[in-house]
Amino acid sequence: SAAVAAMTTIITIIMQMGILQLGLETIDACSKDQLTAILEELAYGNEYGDVLRAKGMLPSEKEGEWYYFDMVPEQYEIRTGAPDYTGKVCVIGANLKEDELKKAFGRN
């Protein structure tokens, strides 16, 4: 069917582009300034690779407050939310620099 052919084409393009997903868990607290700097680089730079999407939740420096974030190229949002058990980050892109991303999000 046309839908299957289109999906096969999309999957082929993604594989050729080397799109990867990196998932991290962390308990390290993060300041809003630190998170903003990371998201600025993810959204506008290439220090971490060619990032297409990032989202996650991290504990802030304030007890009981967490930052939730979403990022696409040239745009990101940070908001506060309810605490969770552990911080989680998901980054999708090509040529991802895993070690640099782990370092940025406190997973050395």
Predicted feature locations:
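Conserved nucleotide- and phosphate/pyrophosphate-binding catalytic cores
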Residues: 87
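C-terminal accessory "lid"/substrate-recognition subdomains
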Residues: 1-83, 94-108
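Flexible loop/N-cap segments at domain edges
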Residues: 91
